[in-house]
Regions:
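Conserved Class I S-adenosyl-L-methionine-dependent methyltransferase catalytic core
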Residues: 94-200
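Membrane-proximal basic amphipathic "stem/tether" segments
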Residues: 1-96
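A short, conserved alpha-helix within the catalytic core of class I
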Residues: 284-295
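S-adenosyl-L-methionine
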Residues: 245-269
Length: 367
């Protein structure tokens, strides 16, 4: 372990008279026990905490999805990598010569490692749930829930439900309804947008979701906002489009929700009130981000919300592993940053739950 030096005990050695010298090991302490204790002490001096996993943490780490809620009928047979619809989407996306179709993170090897198709709402590439919370997951989720509900002025927690389908980890606290990371993130994002730009007061609200994933926010917003007139989902990853088509159909979202294929991006609407990008641009190249920003700018969308994976700045993910800043690229397209704040606004809470995501809200200048 770098920076940690372990002082080994004196090992008993033979004397010339056949007896051995007294060991400096504590009475009845085995070598393995001593090594474990010394390793933990050395790690602590280096700022590393070594601790035993509790049973709760072992359960969450053992599997990446919650299978306590069975899959709907036919889901396992349909949600397969060899589904003809997915194969067709992949071929169409691979044939595109646009930056949004060239992936630096969401490549086939990444998806094979980080996504179980039938359990796409589990802890995976779309929504980090258990791996991000680590030990004491239930306690950390409880604290995050209290923070989100404190700002739930729209009372979405009373309108939206969590059923745990497709592998979502759910948590129950007392008589409260089940919550999940999917649900809490959605409640938080919708309330934030309403507080900043009056989302619920816009007649015939139109939303563009770039990097929509499996359709999490589309499902929640269409269920919670009666003024929603149009919600378009688009994603540069064929698997995401495939899952989004399935999930929005399964949830029976209204016709106002559309899933637009990347190879038909010209079918996007001409007018939107807000564009959202949640944990997506951070996983794209700078060229792909600029391509998407051009689509936003040419429609003169008044508001743009970006939630990156990086806590310090808006950054891309390049093939060589570098992460390039792209805030200026947003500003260069006629936008100004009007608000940035942590998604959890208590400094003490963020340290306890170790979630440091930020909201970045931009407004088009001159509106």
């Amino acid at each position: 372990m770098a920076g940690v030096r372990l002082q080994l005990p004196t090992v008993p050695s033979p004397r010339t008279d056949g007896r051995i010298t007294r060991s400096k090991l504590p009475y009845r302490e085995s070598m393995s026990t001593w090594l474990r204790r010394q390793t933990k002490a050395g790690a602590a001096r280096a700022g590393i905490m070594v601790s035993r996993l509790d049973e709760e943490s072992r359960r969450y780490i053992a599997v990446n999805h919650n299978d306590s809620v069975p899959l709907p009928a036919g889901a396992e047979d349909f949600l397969r990598r060899d589904n003809p619809r997915l194969v067709e989407l992949e071929a169409a996306y691979d044939a595109l010569a646009i930056p949004a179709a060239a992936h630096t993170q969401w490549r086939p090897s990444f998806l094979r490692k980080n996504l179980a198709m039938s359990w796409f709402r589990g802890d995976n590439a779309y929504v980090w749930q258990i791996r991000q919370l680590g030990r004491a997951t239930r306690l950390r989720m409880y604290l995050a829930m209290l923070d989100v509900l404190e700002r739930d002025d729209l009372r979405l927690a009373e309108k939206l439900e969590e059923d745990g389908l497709f592998g979502a980890w759910t948590f129950e606290f007392g008589d409260r309804p089940s919550v999940s990371r999917d649900l809490l993130d959605s409640i938080n994002e919708i309330n934030y947008l309403d507080d900043q730009m009056g989302l619920t007061s816009i007649d015939e609200l139109r939303v563009l979701d770039i990097g929509a994933g499996y359709g999490r926010l589309a499902h929640r917003m269409s269920a919670g906002l009666p003024n929603l007139a149009a919600y378009d989902c688009i994603d540069g990853v064929a698997t995401s489009t495939f899952l989004c088509e399935y999930y929005t159909r399964f949830r029976q979202v209204p016709e106002s929700v559309r899933v637009i294929r990347l190879d038909r991006h010209e079918e996007l609407g001409e007018r939107y009130d807000v564009a959202v990008n949640i944990h997506s641009f951070s996983e794209c190249s700078i060229d792909a981000i600029r391509w998407w920003l051009d689509r936003i700018a040419e429609r003169q969308i008044p508001w743009l919300l970006i939630v990156p994976n990086t806590p310090d700045e808006l950054r891309s993910t390049e093939l060589d592993g570098s992460m390039l800043p792209f805030r200026q690229d947003v500003l260069d397209r006629g936008y100004e940053l009007v608000d940035t704040r942590p998604i959890h606004q208590s400094d003490e809470l963020r340290e306890l739950i170790d979630l440091h995501d930020q909201f970045y809200l931009f407004r088009r200048t001159g509106i």
